[in-house]
A protein has these predicted regions:
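Short, basic and Ser/Thr-rich N-terminal targeting/leader segments
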Residues: 4, 13, 26-30, 51, ...
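Short helix/loop capping segments that flank catalytic or ligand/cofactor-binding pockets
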Residues: 13, 43-45, 65-67
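Short Gly/aromatic-enriched secondary-structure transition segments
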Residues: 45-56
Length: 187
Protein backbone atom coordinates (compact mmCIF):
# COMPACT_ATOMS: atom_id res chain seq x y z
CA UNK A 1 0.00 0.00 0.00
CA UNK A 2 1.48 3.32 -1.08
CA UNK A 3 0.08 6.80 -0.56
CA UNK A 4 1.45 10.32 -0.80
CA UNK A 5 1.33 12.98 1.90
CA UNK A 6 1.46 16.69 1.01
CA UNK A 7 4.03 19.11 2.42
CA UNK A 8 1.22 20.73 4.45
CA UNK A 9 1.02 17.55 6.55
CA UNK A 10 4.63 18.01 7.73
CA UNK A 11 5.25 19.41 11.20
CA UNK A 12 8.00 19.52 13.77
CA UNK A 13 8.67 16.74 16.27
CA UNK A 14 7.10 18.57 19.20
CA UNK A 15 4.43 20.62 17.42
CA UNK A 16 0.77 20.00 18.25
CA UNK A 17 -1.21 17.60 16.07
CA UNK A 18 -4.48 19.17 14.92
CA UNK A 19 -7.47 16.83 14.85
CA UNK A 20 -9.53 17.89 11.82
CA UNK A 21 -13.16 18.98 12.04
CA UNK A 22 -15.43 15.96 11.76
CA UNK A 23 -12.68 13.52 12.73
CA UNK A 24 -13.80 10.54 14.80
CA UNK A 25 -10.93 8.07 14.65
CA UNK A 26 -7.58 9.88 14.71
CA UNK A 27 -4.81 7.32 15.17
CA UNK A 28 -1.04 7.12 15.71
CA UNK A 29 1.72 5.23 13.87
CA UNK A 30 5.40 5.35 14.85
CA UNK A 31 7.51 4.75 11.74
CA UNK A 32 11.07 4.87 10.45
CA UNK A 33 11.47 7.54 7.78
CA UNK A 34 14.01 6.98 5.00
CA UNK A 35 15.28 10.30 3.61
CA UNK A 36 16.45 10.24 0.01
CA UNK A 37 19.80 11.93 -0.60
CA UNK A 38 20.18 11.83 -4.38
CA UNK A 39 17.87 11.51 -7.37
CA UNK A 40 16.75 7.89 -7.70
CA UNK A 41 15.03 6.44 -10.76
CA UNK A 42 14.93 2.73 -11.61
CA UNK A 43 17.38 1.89 -8.84
CA UNK A 44 18.37 -1.74 -8.21
CA UNK A 45 17.98 -3.20 -4.72
CA UNK A 46 21.73 -3.74 -4.64
CA UNK A 47 22.34 0.01 -5.11
CA UNK A 48 19.28 1.37 -3.30
CA UNK A 49 20.87 2.21 0.05
CA UNK A 50 23.47 4.41 -1.67
CA UNK A 51 20.60 6.82 -2.47
CA UNK A 52 19.64 7.18 1.21
CA UNK A 53 20.86 10.33 3.01
CA UNK A 54 19.67 9.17 6.40
CA UNK A 55 16.85 8.26 8.71
CA UNK A 56 14.27 10.14 10.78
CA UNK A 57 11.53 9.43 13.27
CA UNK A 58 8.03 9.86 11.76
CA UNK A 59 4.57 9.81 13.32
CA UNK A 60 2.23 8.84 10.46
CA UNK A 61 -0.94 10.23 12.07
CA UNK A 62 -4.08 8.90 10.38
CA UNK A 63 -7.80 9.64 10.51
CA UNK A 64 -9.35 6.19 10.09
CA UNK A 65 -12.91 7.39 9.44
CA UNK A 66 -11.69 9.59 6.57
CA UNK A 67 -9.39 6.82 5.37
CA UNK A 68 -11.73 3.83 5.52
CA UNK A 69 -15.31 5.12 5.81
CA UNK A 70 -17.54 7.81 4.27
CA UNK A 71 -16.21 7.06 0.80
CA UNK A 72 -12.80 7.05 2.41
CA UNK A 73 -9.52 7.43 0.64
CA UNK A 74 -6.05 6.77 2.01
CA UNK A 75 -4.86 10.24 0.99
CA UNK A 76 -7.82 11.89 2.73
CA UNK A 77 -7.13 9.99 5.94
CA UNK A 78 -3.37 10.59 5.93
CA UNK A 79 -2.93 14.10 4.52
CA UNK A 80 -4.41 16.48 7.10
CA UNK A 81 -2.31 19.42 8.25
CA UNK A 82 0.20 18.39 10.99
CA UNK A 83 -0.34 14.65 10.34
CA UNK A 84 3.36 13.98 9.66
CA UNK A 85 5.56 15.07 12.57
CA UNK A 86 9.21 14.46 11.58
CA UNK A 87 12.44 14.63 13.57
CA UNK A 88 13.94 15.72 15.91
CA UNK A 89 16.91 15.28 13.59
CA UNK A 90 18.20 13.52 10.51
CA UNK A 91 20.71 10.80 11.36
CA UNK A 92 22.96 10.22 8.35
CA UNK A 93 23.05 6.76 6.82
CA UNK A 94 26.68 6.21 7.84
CA UNK A 95 25.71 6.72 11.50
CA UNK A 96 23.09 3.95 11.48
CA UNK A 97 24.80 0.56 11.53
CA UNK A 98 21.67 -1.37 10.50
CA UNK A 99 18.41 0.50 9.89
CA UNK A 100 16.60 -2.85 9.95
CA UNK A 101 17.55 -3.42 13.60
CA UNK A 102 16.12 -0.37 15.38
CA UNK A 103 13.65 -0.49 18.25
CA UNK A 104 10.70 1.87 18.03
CA UNK A 105 7.88 2.70 20.44
CA UNK A 106 4.94 5.03 21.03
CA UNK A 107 2.98 6.03 24.13
CA UNK A 108 -0.38 7.76 24.43
CA UNK A 109 -0.90 9.60 27.72
CA UNK A 110 1.98 7.62 29.24
CA UNK A 111 0.66 4.19 28.19
CA UNK A 112 3.01 2.20 25.92
CA UNK A 113 0.86 1.10 22.97
CA UNK A 114 3.51 0.32 20.34
CA UNK A 115 6.79 -1.46 21.01
CA UNK A 116 8.49 -3.02 18.01
CA UNK A 117 11.54 -3.22 15.79
CA UNK A 118 12.35 -2.39 12.20
CA UNK A 119 13.48 -6.03 11.86
CA UNK A 120 9.77 -6.82 11.41
CA UNK A 121 9.18 -4.50 8.45
CA UNK A 122 7.13 -6.22 5.75
CA UNK A 123 9.43 -4.78 3.07
CA UNK A 124 13.11 -4.03 3.56
CA UNK A 125 14.43 -0.52 3.05
CA UNK A 126 16.43 -1.37 -0.09
CA UNK A 127 13.39 -3.12 -1.53
CA UNK A 128 11.17 -0.08 -0.86
CA UNK A 129 13.59 2.41 -2.45
CA UNK A 130 14.07 0.17 -5.49
CA UNK A 131 10.36 -0.56 -5.93
CA UNK A 132 9.17 3.03 -5.58
CA UNK A 133 11.93 4.39 -7.84
CA UNK A 134 10.65 2.03 -10.53
CA UNK A 135 7.51 4.10 -11.10
CA UNK A 136 8.30 7.54 -9.67
CA UNK A 137 11.54 9.44 -9.42
CA UNK A 138 12.62 10.02 -5.84
CA UNK A 139 14.26 13.37 -5.14
CA UNK A 140 16.59 14.56 -2.37
CA UNK A 141 14.53 15.25 0.72
CA UNK A 142 11.74 12.83 -0.13
CA UNK A 143 10.79 10.72 2.88
CA UNK A 144 9.62 7.12 2.65
CA UNK A 145 7.77 5.98 5.78
CA UNK A 146 8.30 2.27 6.19
CA UNK A 147 5.24 1.07 8.11
CA UNK A 148 4.28 0.69 11.74
CA UNK A 149 4.36 -2.09 14.34
CA UNK A 150 1.25 -3.48 16.01
CA UNK A 151 -0.51 -1.32 18.56
CA UNK A 152 -2.29 1.42 16.61
CA UNK A 153 -5.64 2.62 17.99
CA UNK A 154 -7.59 0.74 15.33
CA UNK A 155 -6.05 -2.52 16.58
CA UNK A 156 -6.52 -1.99 20.33
CA UNK A 157 -8.39 -4.75 22.20
CA UNK A 158 -11.04 -5.31 23.34
CA UNK A 159 -12.19 -2.13 21.56
CA UNK A 160 -10.36 0.32 19.29
CA UNK A 161 -9.71 3.75 20.81
CA UNK A 162 -8.55 6.94 19.23
CA UNK A 163 -6.93 10.28 19.94
CA UNK A 164 -8.85 13.27 21.24
CA UNK A 165 -7.94 16.86 22.06
CA UNK A 166 -5.62 16.96 25.07
CA UNK A 167 -4.06 13.54 24.46
CA UNK A 168 -0.27 13.43 24.34
CA UNK A 169 1.72 11.13 22.06
CA UNK A 170 5.35 10.40 22.89
CA UNK A 171 7.41 8.25 20.54
CA UNK A 172 10.95 7.31 19.66
CA UNK A 173 13.35 5.19 17.65
CA UNK A 174 16.68 4.02 19.08
CA UNK A 175 19.40 6.44 17.98
CA UNK A 176 16.97 8.75 16.15
CA UNK A 177 15.52 10.66 19.08
CA UNK A 178 12.08 11.24 20.52
CA UNK A 179 9.00 13.31 19.73
CA UNK A 180 6.06 14.55 21.81
CA UNK A 181 2.82 15.93 20.39
CA UNK A 182 -0.28 17.22 22.14
CA UNK A 183 -3.50 16.78 20.19
CA UNK A 184 -5.62 19.89 19.66
CA UNK A 185 -9.01 20.35 18.03
CA UNK A 186 -9.15 22.26 14.75
CA UNK A 187 -10.32 25.84 15.22
Amino acid sequence: MLFLKPNSSLSGPNDPVTIPRGALKTDWEVELGVVIGSKASYVSQADALSYVAGYVLVNDVSERAFQLERGGQWDKGKAADTFTPVGPWLVTADEVADPQQLSLWLEVNGKRVQDGTTANLIFGIAELVSYISGFMTLHPGDIISTGTPAGVGLGQKPEPWYLKAGDVMRLGIAGLGEQSQTCVAAA
